[in-house]
Amino acid sequence: MKLFVYHTPELTPKDQVPDCAIAVDVLRATSTIATVLSAGGEAVQVFSDLDELIAVSEAWPPQKRLRAGERGGGKVTGFELGNSPLDCTPELVEGRRLFISTTNGTRALKRVQDSATVLTAAFINRAAVVQYLLEKQPEIVWIVGSGWEGSYSLEDTACAGAIAHSVVEKSQLPPEELAGNDEVISAIALYSQWQNNLLGLFHHASHGKRLLRLECYEDLKYCSQTDVLTVLPIQQEAGVFKTKN
């Protein structure tokens, strides 16, 4: 198994797909996806385009769907939800499909959707992702950060490092043997420095500051937890994620 970390979807190799792609958008899309599925959501379907989301979701009965839209950190007008995982309670999401479009996370998922296996990862479900990698041993693994509008993101890179760090620890293989690019080593180093204060890291991150200005402190606190959910969101058909416990 070789791990490759890409800081944004735009940095992934063109005309290639890996055996397993892991999309990361800690703040907040992949944290929300894991939360919805853990709370009993039927599925999460991701869209880059809001108009397409509305058109596809119209085919579903209102009682079986939820629409979540976020642009610039704020909720899209007319949608039931924004991108806060804390709004995704079992009472609201159980048995329903969440149709979601966000500024960054859904772009990363669209880029890798043709990979043989596509997973979503956040700190909250890191252990489930690592367990899958160790059990299945895919040959080439991309961990793709969502970034912010094409730019580097501290929190996504730290999460990529958290995954790689745990794979190294549990496989007892040296990092240089698992690392397919230098970004893996730097991501592990970033996570190692901040693993005991991820909330502090979020406060330094540009998107963390953006969410704090929107008074989303509790979201940051929730998303900074590690290994609190056992859910593994896995793509069942293009753009549609269901749980693998």
From Swiss-Prot:
Catalytic activity: (2R)-O-phospho-3-sulfolactate + H2O = (2R)-3-sulfolactate + phosphate
NCBIfam families: PRK00886.1-5
Cofactor(s) listed: Mg(2+)
Entry annotated with the keyword Glycosyltransferase: no
Enzyme Commission identifier(s): 3.1.3.71
Enzyme class: hydrolase
InterPro entries (alphabetical): ComB-like, ComB-like_sf
Gene that specifies this protein: comB
Domain of life from the UniProt record: Bacteria
Gene3D superfamilies: ComB-like
One Gene Ontology term of the molecular function aspect: 2-phosphosulfolactate phosphatase activity
Record's protein name: Probable 2-phosphosulfolactate phosphatase
